[in-house]
Amino acid sequence: MKNNSQIPLVNYHSHTYRCKHAFGEVVEFVKAASEADLEIFGVSDHAAFPDDRWPDIRMRYEELDNYIEAVRVAQLSVPQVKVLLSMECEYVPEFENYLQDELLGERQFDYLIGAGHYTPHNGEWLSSFTKLNCKPHLKSYVEHLCQMMESKLFEFIAHPDIFGST
């Protein structure tokens, strides 16, 4: 597909099999991005957390090194696309240092995406897609998104509209 616009073709939000709801390996996605004339492709699987919480939609912490290596291989294999290392992360205040110091710092992630799959409400984490069915829950969701943005850890928020929950 020819891009006649002055706006570059980019994708900053993508998932591989590691998210448990997608398929494919990083290099396959980047090759497809190249074939579609994308200039920039951000690989952004759901973040692993050191305590492996919410394992049904994210990779385990022990998979993190393999994930980073898969992105590095794709960067070398498809040099015509700028491949960025990222993760889509729940904002869990107790893991701010992990996100800032380990992912953005030590492991040199290019950026992080904020995610609102889970919402803290009265001491528990509710699924944002199935449990936000009353005003107090929605208020908690909005407050949590605001805290996420105020943390300045994330470049943008993925699907803040909690799609699929109407």
Question: Which role does the model predict for each range below?
Answer:
Residues M1-P93, Y98, G164-T166:
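An N-terminally biased module of ancient metal coordination in phosphate/nucleic-acid-related enzymes
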Residues W54, Y61-T166:
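Extended substrate/RNA-proximal surfaces in nucleic-acid metabolism proteins
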